């Protein structure tokens, strides 16, 4: 995908496959607002200016298990820096579905700890604009986060809202988020909800 028209076509394709706007946003590594804009522009329903966002394509990493393992190993190394600085350790690695899970699996293996999976609320949005009322959930097929020190892993931070709701869920269940690690950070914050953020790449706009 090289331009906005390619993005619109891909967004339409994903919608036709049954994905909701929150899921489309994850697939294209854009904000939910940008995904909605792409879909409404495709239907000629908006003349609004595009949201300020950056499209990320890391599929050359994601489709290769060896590359994925190498990248996740780098993320584990970044996490180690935070844990040493805080003089703490980790009980469970939390992968944010979908793209954060394979990365988190490698990081959990590196540390010899359990893997938890959290499904963001936006994945259960009905596209009525009420997605913020939907709460994230911890998958019952993986480890729980109750009373545990957690490291959160995802591929991209865009607005940070998914991270914020993930941290809140962990805290509500008596756990503690001690670090966040991502491949790409588009938000540019050193912390989210007072949890340190580590990134392999940080992207900033010059407007």
UniProtKB/Swiss-Prot annotation:
Source species, domain of life: Archaea
GO biological process, one term: regulation of gene expression
PROSITE patterns xref list: PUR_PYR_PR_TRANSFER
Entry keyword annotation includes Transcription: yes
Keywords, alphabetical: DNA-binding, Transcription, Transcription regulation
UniProt cross-references to InterPro entries, sorted A to Z: GfcR-like, PRibTrfase_dom, PRTase-like
Free-text comment on this protein's domains from its UniProt entry: Contains an N-terminal DNA-binding winged helix-turn-helix domain and a C-terminal regulatory domain (or effector binding domain) resembling phosphoribosyltransferase (PRT) domain.
PANTHER family the UniProt entry points to: OROTATE PHOSPHORIBOSYLTRANSFERASE, PYRE-LIKE PROTEIN
UniProt-recorded name of the protein: Transcriptional regulator GfcR
Species for this entry: Methanocella arvoryzae (strain DSM 22066 / NBRC 105507 / MRE50)
Gene field: gfcR
């Amino acid at each position: 995908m090289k331009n906005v028209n390619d993005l619109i076509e891909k967004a339409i394709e994903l919608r036709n496959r049954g994905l909701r706007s929150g899921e489309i946003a994850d697939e294209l590594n854009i904000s939910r607002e940008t995904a909605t804009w792409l879909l409404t522009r495709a239907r000629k329903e908006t003349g609004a200016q595009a949201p300020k966002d950056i499209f990320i394509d890391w599929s050359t990493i994601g489709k290769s298990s060896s590359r994925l393992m190498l990248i996740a190993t780098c993320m584990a190394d970044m996490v180690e820096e935070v844990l040493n600085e805080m003089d703490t350790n980790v009980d469970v690695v939390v992968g944010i579905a979908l793209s954060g899970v394979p990365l988190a699996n490698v990081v959990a293996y590196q540390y010899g700890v359990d893997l938890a999976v959290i499904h963001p609320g936006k994945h259960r949005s009905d596209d009525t604009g009420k997605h913020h009322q939907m709460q994230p959930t911890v998958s019952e097929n993986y480890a729980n986060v109750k009373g545990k020190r957690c490291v959160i892993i995802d591929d991209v931070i865009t607005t940070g809202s998914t991270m914020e709701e993930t941290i809140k869920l962990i805290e509500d269940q008596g756990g503690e988020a001690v670090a966040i690690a991502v491949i790409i950070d588009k938000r540019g914050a050193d912390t989210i909800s007072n949890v340190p953020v580590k990134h392999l790449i940080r992207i900033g706009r010059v407007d």
